[in-house]
């Protein structure tokens, strides 16, 4: 079986393998010049034969990635309405994300 890891970023958890492309919430310190992304909150690793479960994180495990692009999510529409008062309000929101390609799993 192929090695994989479970990482936590932006209060969400992702199962990643080398070569995967994931969309994560914006991270501090990431720009077009600084394209390397390090995920140090690794909750679980599997190297093909042995699994390591963190308490709460696996000690020296790091997942490395590189920035592919800045993307925006789907539009979420919220609609406020009050009956018989001729009041309605439509609000839209699009979340900004980083598209990251996983380059290495260091276990």
Swiss-Prot record:
A GO CC term assigned to this protein in UniProt: ribonucleoprotein complex
Pfam families registered for this protein in UniProt: Ribosomal_L21p (PF00829)
Domain of life, per lineage: Bacteria
Alphabetical keyword list: Ribonucleoprotein, Ribosomal protein, RNA-binding, rRNA-binding
Keyword RNA-binding among UniProt keywords: yes
GO molecular function: rRNA binding; structural constituent of ribosome
Alphabetized InterPro entries for the sequence: bL21-like, bL21-like_sf, Ribosomal_bL21, Ribosomal_bL21_CS
GO BP, sorted A to Z: translation
UniProt subunit comment: Part of the 50S ribosomal subunit. Contacts protein L20.
NCBIfam families per record: L21 (TIGR00061)
Its job: This protein binds to 23S rRNA in the presence of protein L20.
Family of the protein in this entry: Belongs to the bacterial ribosomal protein bL21 family.
Protein name, as recorded: Large ribosomal subunit protein bL21
Gene: rplU
């Amino acid at each position: 079986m192929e090695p994989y890891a479970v990482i936590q970023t932006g209060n969400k958890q992702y199962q990643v393998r080398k070569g995967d492309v994931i969309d994560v919430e914006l991270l501090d310190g990431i720009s077009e010049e600084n394209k390397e992304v390090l995920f140090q909150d690794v909750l679980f690793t599997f190297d093909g034969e042995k699994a390591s479960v963190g308490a709460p994180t696996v000690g020296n495990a790091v997942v490395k990635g590189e920035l592919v692009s800045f993307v925006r999510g789907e539009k979420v529409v919220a609609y406020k309405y009050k009956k018989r008062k001729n009041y309605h309000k439509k609000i839209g929101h699009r979340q900004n994300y980083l598209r990251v390609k996983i380059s290495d799993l260091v276990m």
